[in-house]
């Protein structure tokens, strides 16, 4: 299957002049200046701060202090394009895109113009947002929270969309994948409550997080088989989970686990200089997810 996906990507790229051009993003767009660092921040902000509105001001300050060039956001509940634009202005981003206004929207902001916006709602629980900025195609990811079968279909749809991009495209996948990496399996295997927790969760929510009573690692494996690089894993010194934080200690949230990732195509991963989960006292009380960050240099077009 993964070989087919990679072949399809080449076929789509070659077919651009023959009628697939409407699906391809325009070439020659402005990129970051050579030598400049390019920083991405990805953050699931838990129901758009509707549950804990007092955390919003701290969140805006945190993002501003991080000084990202591009931001991938999940769970922008109750947001409008104007509301996202106001947030983006707080961290000096004049450009922003909201996927939708209902349900659990994703959003994207940038210090540079955003082009090639592609919104896909069909086939995805929360939708898929694709944008281009700084010479990079960025997918804002938020996969299904409670069903491994649906997540697998979403991954396949994501890879089909990826196949429509030019062969040499630099691509990032950033967001809340709601699933597990084989790189973290040794940590999860040592947890006495990981499987029992998901059994409780699936029973409570009528979900399907477990496949045959076990964690399902196939989703991210398919991305890596297609050539994507897990940047956090590549740069980290040890495991850090991105969920849960200390914000919901009164709830049964299960053991810490990594749900938030940034994946890059090899041509972009080669310029990655840093990638990390931002776990500290501040981020522990802003949302139920910790943010993740990646930095690239040189960021050439």
Residue ranges and their predicted role:
Residues 6-9, 14-18, 24, 29-87, ...:
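N-terminal, active-site-proximal structural segment of metallo-dependent hydrolase catalytic domains
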Residues 156-255, 259:
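Metal-dependent phosphoesterases centered on the DNase I-like endonuclease/exonuclease/phosphatase
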Residues 73-153:
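Structured beta-strand-rich core segments of catalytic domains in phosphoester-bond hydrolases
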Residues 103-116, 223-224, 254-270:
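Conserved beta strand-loop-helix elements of the APE1-like EEP
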Residues 109-111, 129-134, 265-266, 287, ...:
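Active-site beta-strand termini and strand-to-loop segments that position acidic
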Residues 38-45, 59-81, 138, 158-188, ...:
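Active-site beta-strand/loop signature of hydrolases that rely on acidic residues for catalysis
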Residues 55, 59, 80, 84, ...:
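Stable alpha-helical elements in mature extracytoplasmic
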Residues 103-106, 124-130, 256-261, 288-293:
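Short hydrophobic/aromatic beta-strand or adjacent loop that forms the aromatic wall/cage
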């Amino acid at each position: 299957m993964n070989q087919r996906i990679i072949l399809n990507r080449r076929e789509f790229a070659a077919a651009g002049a023959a009628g697939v051009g409407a699906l391809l993003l325009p070439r020659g767009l402005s990129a970051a200046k050579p030598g400049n660092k390019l920083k991405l921040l990805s953050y699931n902000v838990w129901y758009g701060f509707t549950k804990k509105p007092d955390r919003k001001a701290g969140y805006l300050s945190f993002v501003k202090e991080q000084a990202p060039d591009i931001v991938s956001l999940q769970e922008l509940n109750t947001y409008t394009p104007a509301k996202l634009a106001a947030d983006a202005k707080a961290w000096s981003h004049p450009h922003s895109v909201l996927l939708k206004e209902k349900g659990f929207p994703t959003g994207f902001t940038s210090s540079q113009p955003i082009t090639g916006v592609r919104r896909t709602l069909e086939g995805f629980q929360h939708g898929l947002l694709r944008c281009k900025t700084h010479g990079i195609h960025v997918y804002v990811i938020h996969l299904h929270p409670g069903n491994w079968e649906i997540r697998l279909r979403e991954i396949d749809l994501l890879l089909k969309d990826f196949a429509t991009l030019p062969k040499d495209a630099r691509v990032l996948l950033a967001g809340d994948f709601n699933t597990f990496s084989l790189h973290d399996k040794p940590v999860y295997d040592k947890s006495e409550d990981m499987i029992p927790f998901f059994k409780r969760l699936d029973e409570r929510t009528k979900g399907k997080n477990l496949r045959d009573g076990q964690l399902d690692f196939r989703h991210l494996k398919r991305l890596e088989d297609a050539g994507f690089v897990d940047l956090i894993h590549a740069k980290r010194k040890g495991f850090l989970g991105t969920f849960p934080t200390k914000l919901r200690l009164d709830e049964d949230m299960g053991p810490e686990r990594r749900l938030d990732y940034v994946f890059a195509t090899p041509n972009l991963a080669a310029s990655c200089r840093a990638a990390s989960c931002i776990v500290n006292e501040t981020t522990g009380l802003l949302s139920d997810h910790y943010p993740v960050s990646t930095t690239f240099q040189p960021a050439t077009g």
